[in-house]
Amino acid sequence: SGKWVDGSDAGAALVDPVTGDELARASTAGIDIGAAMAYARDTGGPALRALSYAERAALLGKVADTLVANRDAYFEIAQANSGNTKIDGAIDIDGGIGTIKYFARLGAGLGEAKMLKDGRLERLSKDENFQAAHVSVPLTGVGVHINAFNFPSWGMWEKAAVALLSGVP
């Protein structure tokens, strides 16, 4: 919880689809997924929801900056992991970066709010003494996203950016 944990066995080989060379190994053995979810739900979620939309958007902007700074390395990774051509990799990698930047701009435009007003005030009485407003607030919990293999960057960031901007880890 709150730290990186290595799997406790040899794991499965992740191989280059073109050469068959082993690139890495991955394992979830010995990893307490429930504890990871609890940490995200109980620590990460409240920390994100304490931030305004603009602050969450700024964090997304920093993620985008990091991805841009490492863009060339991602092409090599995309080719090794998926056999992508440079063009296929560019569509995926740049699509992911563009998606994060879009939601960062959108969130910045929402300002310092931590919830969104939905529509106008609704009168609940004959006069205006009793009114109500609908608001959209961040959900509590954890976003678990299943991603397609063909666009691992773009597909992941179109889900994660929305969740993170909304205050859901």
Q: Language model features by range: what are they?
A:
Residues 117-169:
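Conserved small-residue-rich beta-alpha loop and adjacent elements
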Residues 1-126:
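N-terminal Rossmann-like NAD(P)+-binding subdomain of aldehyde/semialdehyde dehydrogenases
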